[in-house]
């Protein structure tokens, strides 16, 4: 399962960029198998895999027709939304267990 593989690789430091005013994304060097089964409502804090090498962290709620593989969710959504939307475009996120 993709989420399990992602967890096995933690901690993981990813340099991310802004996209569409609702997400931060970063490319990982070691690919993760995807099932690309999730599309629809994206929630604040959703952590997704796009393709097999793009980690996406969403900080705004919206609907998408694109398919993602769900990896997890940030627990402190309110704090995330406030801090990450104001963050510099060249940001590094460290994911830990």
Where are these regions (language model features)?
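Glycine-rich active-site loops that engage anionic ligands at enzyme catalytic sites
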Residues: 14-97
């Amino acid at each position: 399962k993709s989420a399990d593989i992602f967890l096995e690789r933690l901690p993981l430091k990813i340099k991310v960029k802004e996209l569409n005013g609702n997400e931060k994304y970063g490319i990982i060097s070691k690919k993760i198998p995807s099932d690309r089964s999730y599309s629809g409502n994206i929630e604040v804090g959703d952590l997704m895999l796009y393709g097999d090498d793009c980690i996406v962290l969403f900080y705004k709620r919206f609907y998408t027709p694109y398919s993602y593989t769900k990896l997890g969710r940030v627990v402190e959504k309110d704090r995330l939304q406030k801090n990450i939307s104001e963050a510099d475009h060249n940001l590094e996120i460290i994911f830990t267990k």
